Each structure stands twice: as C-alpha cells, then as structure tokens.
C-alpha cells in the first residue's frame, strides 16, 4: 500500500489523484500490486483486441487509427500524452480505459463483433491515470498506459498481490 501511495503522489494532476482515490475507495475489491500499480480489468473481443477501434501504441509500436489494439497478455499499451483527453465530462474520448471487473464483464458479454468476448486484468500506474469519466459511476478510469496481465474469469480475490 505504501508503494501505491508513493506512486499516486507522483501523478501531476490533483483531480486525477482524487479520482483514483475515490475509485479505489468505492471499489474495495480492487487489487494493488506490490510495486504500487493498481489492477483493473478490460472487456475485449474474443481475439484480445479492443472492442472500439482507435490509435495507440502496443509495445512501443504505433497502431493505426482504425485498428483494434491488441490487448494480449504481456502487451503494454500506451497513448500519447499530448492527445489524451483529461476532461472527465467527455465520457468516451481519447485515451485508454479500464475499470472494475463488472465494467469489463459487461463489455465482454455484449461484444457484438465476435460474440462473447474475453476479460483481462491490467496493471496501471497511478501516476498515469488522467480522469474518471463522469458516465462511469466510478466504474472506469482513463489512463496513458497499462500492462495486460492475463485473461481472467473472475476478479482477483486478494487485495494486495505480491
């Protein structure tokens, strides 16, 4: 927990720090890794690609605007700092989104493109989170980057994962 607090204090935006703290407080089942990153979840198409197309980087390589980013386990996804939308009132805007397991599960179950999708866990650095979109009712956050951990069928039971 100390590592999480240290990393959270490195986030340059006060409103982002408050959004993360609120998100963790309202979602007590959220796990924190020993290095201080928080664990979130994403709902994806069955081929591990994002449901919505968009620009970003996968393992440092730029991807096209109309492509679906590859969220396979082990991949690191990122979004250019200068293009990300910090405004929480813009609910589906530029940046990478992750959320609670329930949020991700809803996306995976309603994946019209490929039938039932998959859910993955992601490790997110608190210093990279930029906002909590207002439509989410504290179920999702927008960030600059995350690392895909693994495919999951349920949320992690542990609060702190070593």
Feature locations, PLM:
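Active-site or metal-binding loop neighborhoods of secreted/extracellular toxin and effector enzymes
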Residues: 154-162
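ADP-ribosyltransferase catalytic core
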Residues: 76-155
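ADP-ribose/NAD+-binding catalytic cleft of ART/PARP-like enzymes
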Residues: 1-91
């Amino acid at each position: 927990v100390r590592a999480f607090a240290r990393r959270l204090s490195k986030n340059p935006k006060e409103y982002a720090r408050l959004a993360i703290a609120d998100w963790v407080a309202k979602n007590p089942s959220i796990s924190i890794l020993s290095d201080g990153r928080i664990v979130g979840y994403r709902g994806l198409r069955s081929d591990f690609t994002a449901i919505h197309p968009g620009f970003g980087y996968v393992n440092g390589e730029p991807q096209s605007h109309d492509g679906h980013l590859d969220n396979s386990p082990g991949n690191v996804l990122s979004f250019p700092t200068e293009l990300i939308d910090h405004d929480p009132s813009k609910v589906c805007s530029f940046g990478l989104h992750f959320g609670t397991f329930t949020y991700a599960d809803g996306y995976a179950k309603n994946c019209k493109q490929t039938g039932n999708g998959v859910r993955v866990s992601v490790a997110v650095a608190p210093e990279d989170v930029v906002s909590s979109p207002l439509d989410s009712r504290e179920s999702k956050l927008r960030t600059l980057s995350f690392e895909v951990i693994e495919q999951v069928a349920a949320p992690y039971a542990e609060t702190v994962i070593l």
